[in-house]
Amino acid sequence: MLKLLLGDPNARKLKRYQPILTDINLFEDEIASLNDDELRGKTSDFRTRLDKSSDSSIQECLDDLLPEAFAVVREASKRVLGMRHFDVQLIGGMVLHEGQIAEMKTGEGKTLVATLPSFLNALTGRGVHIVTVNDYLARRDAEWMGQVHRFLGLSVGLIQQDMTPIERRKNYECDITYATNSELGFDYLRDNMANDINEIVQRDFQFCIIDEVDSILIDEARTPLIISGQIERPQEKYQKAAEVVSTLQRAAEMGKDGIDPEGDYEVDEKQRTCTLTDEGFAKSEELLKVKDLFDPKDPWAHYITNALKAKELFVKDVNYIVRNEDAVIVDEFTGRVMPGRRWSDGQHQAIEAKEELPIQPETQTLASITYQNFFLLYPRLAGMTGTAKTEEVEFEKTYKLETTVIPTNRPRSRADWVDQVFKTESAKWRAVANETVEIHKKGRPVLVGTTSVEKSEVLSALLGEQDVPHNLLNAKPENVEREAEIIAQAGRAGAVTIATNMAGRGTDIILGGNSDYMARLKVREVLFPKLVKPEDSHKPPVPLQRRKDSSVGFGKEENNSKDKKVNHSNDVRAQENLYPCVLTDSTEQVLLDLEHQLIKEWGDRVLSPIELEDRISTAAEKAPTQDPLVQSLREAISLVKSEYDVVVKQEEVHVREAGGLHVIGTERHESRRVDNQLRGRAGRQGDLGSTRFFLSLGDNLLRIFGGDRVAALMNAFRVDEDMPIESGMLTRSLESAQKKVETYYFDIRKQVFEYDEVMNNQRRAVYSERHRVLEGDELKKQVIGYGERTMQEIVYAYVNPELPSEEWDLKQLVGKVKEFVYLLDDLKPKDIEALNIDELQAFLQEQLRNAYDLKESQIEESRPGLMREAERFFILQQIDTLWREHLQSMDALRESVGLRGYGQKDPLIEYKNEGYDMFLEMMTNMRRNVIYSMFMFQPAPPSDKE
């Protein structure tokens, strides 16, 4: 109704950009007439104009430059990438520049849009960060889109997991830096644990553009980034707890009205908790031969609870995979493995005990921050995604980010077919396999989205039984390494790709296949064995060639004989069909000559895989180069691509005529947004395409959140299990379940944010104090300030101004002063008995300053400059030690404060108040410990060698 009365607010917003869009288009001919050097010269021209503006007017100046700057980027992109920004992409760029979220559908070129505001804001010289969800995408975008920025004279940096601090600092100093959210966050935490200013790698934050913003700011918001150190806990307790739990029986249903159900423990999948019943407690205590699981001297409750969760809530090949005797977490949103990440509070150790793996030591938090509070550190924040509108309220409330929906460049031609719901899971998977086979036979590519590694392997086995060649993209390491290759061919005629949770998200599926990427892979395959060091040559899978007489499309080769027994789906993986055709003899000869030329110039097998990858990527760019080797490499890639293009273009026509990409969803996700992301893979840029979801009444979403209505439906449908069910009531149950889950998780994220906000204020205070110390030229002044404050606190602790001075306990006061400052050993109570409280405070502070000067002269005799080093060392040591303990105390407070709700108290307010008192106490202890340490410090005598 409001839309009818007031008009669509999104349409009104878009209308506001039209005059600026007209201005950009008016610049197009003028900018196009410039030669390359003149176009590059525009960057320094813009910077000169910016330098003339004051800090307060810099934003206005950027806004004034926007039309011409965007026109320059559009022209550079045309020349370097062969891609011209559409008008809707220019609008997307304006939305990002204003610090909003731009919702752009899959395939509308979000990556290209980011080049516009990143160029404009990088002109300030203060740095722009472009954030992606994984290393592969960060690297791809830095190589691909970075060409435009490099062409225009800007420096482009890239942060990758295995970089050294020196490499990181160099890349953060660039005008535009591509990085993943986790690398940025961990670098921030590490910088705030540095003991030397030269160890800091990041500079002050300015402007940040987040790609797939919903994934990072919504999906990842519940998980804090944590840097931890090891602590010792008895490993045998984890093993014993796993043994005990394996004998306990799960209750068939949850207890009601405080009455325990039959069984040893109950599981609440919605809240993700496991609770022992009275019977379970008794049985556990008997098996462990202890009187009380909660005995503080020999606690067991924590170990048993974690073992129960490991048994019931953490599923192998869904939540984690086992690799090289290690339990590796699988990201529930992307389906990727997260090596190096571990669950905290002993949960990971419980999983290792369950899987009978070596148990790693437990960890203690040294530093942590949530993504919510990390990204709020940026003065200006913007983001892009294909699906933001469903979370619009959360973006607005938590991050103060508006969402603007950018129209598509071409109208959508995708058909979303009606859901098919089956009674059982096995019937659903059979139906998925049958539809996949049917669509595959028509020559259309199929993308099947699954929710776990385990489910993807089930479908892979079913397709293997029907001899359907397919590619599997999930968290298993052998598949992750082929991610780009799998996505490159996912749009080919008849291709079947099974992907876990959007694992290839961020990479477009191009109908007919991606000839550009196939050509790069081919050149890489030829050069890899000859140029990469033998110890690094864990060679990528080498695909077999398609024979010249094979038909167009993604069919099976004749040599895959049908009578071969299929033991596992790997037998029919479609890897051999990566390259669309055999190269001509002349092109093969060009590759051979190139190989000899590069061995001669670069050396025989001396490069690392990353170095070779870098050189191939540089050659695949269109940016100008003076290097003859890069030029030869570029010509070879172009030659291979032109041959592949012939077949790929043919396939593209076949695929379009057959109906485009078909996407199958095998389970409704907890969030409608994730379902929309999967659907959005089909029908990019107005292409034809279709989607369908297959569901079963046993799917997690319906089982956990659908409640009794779904249970009633299961009994009501007396149909054959292979017969799909269609029911309005079921559809409504699904939608209602999804909304319930979205609200439930929004509340959790909101709570995480509110509690972390308390920690965030404390974190900022501690980190700014640390930074002051690292940069500190005035450390002496700071330490004396700590001492003066300590003297003031001692005076007020031992002197009551309301009592006459004769009753003051000056003996104890003097004793306490000497505890901190032993150099005041000759101070006597009679020296201060005539002073009032203010005079007493001033006198003690004066004595402290004199004693500190004396201490400094003693220390400096040992080595000039040593006093400043000692000050820095002791302040940082105390901050880090006490902050670490404070984090643990705050965690414990947060665990216990929830119970206060039963006493009609607001847990959050209690947490804020007590947390604040604990923080003040920590800062007081830090000041006192530093003063004590400085006066007690005795440098070691110089050694004889010196």
From Swiss-Prot:
Its EC number is 7.4.2.8. It catalyses: ATP + H2O + cellular proteinSide 1 = ADP + phosphate + cellular proteinSide 2. ATP binds at Q89, G107, E108, G109, K110, T111, D508. Its main location: membrane. It is a peripheral membrane protein. GO terms for biological process: intracellular protein transmembrane transport; protein import; protein targeting; protein transport by the Sec complex. It comes from the Bacteria. It is an enzyme of class 7 (translocase). It is found in: Cell inner membrane; Cellular thylakoid membrane; Cytoplasm. The keyword Cell membrane applies. InterPro entries: Helicase_ATP-bd (IPR014001), P-loop_NTPase (IPR027417), SecA (IPR000185), SecA_CS (IPR020937), SecA_DEAD (IPR011115), SecA_motor_DEAD (IPR014018), SecA_preprotein_X-link_dom (IPR011130), SecA_SF2_C (IPR044722). Residues 546-569 have a biased composition (Basic and acidic residues). Residues 534-569 are annotated as: Disordered. GO terms for molecular function: ATP binding; protein-exporting ATPase activity. GO terms for cellular component: cell envelope Sec protein transport complex; cytosol; plasma membrane-derived thylakoid membrane. Keywords: ATP-binding, Cell inner membrane, Cell membrane, Cytoplasm, Membrane, Nucleotide-binding, Protein transport, Thylakoid, Translocase, Translocation, Transport. NCBIfam families: secA. Part of the Sec protein translocase complex. Interacts with the SecYEG preprotein conducting channel. Has a central role in coupling the hydrolysis of ATP to the transfer of proteins into and across the cell membrane, serving as an ATP-driven molecular motor driving the stepwise translocation of polypeptide chains across the membrane. Probably participates in protein translocation into and across both the cytoplasmic and thylakoid membranes in cyanobacterial cells. Monomer and homodimer. Part of the essential Sec protein translocation apparatus which comprises SecA, SecYEG and auxiliary proteins SecDF. Other proteins may also be involved. Belongs to the SecA family. This is Protein translocase subunit SecA. It comes from Prochlorococcus marinus (strain SARG / CCMP1375 / SS120). The lineage of its organism: Bacteria, Bacillati, Cyanobacteriota, Cyanophyceae, Synechococcales. The gene is secA.
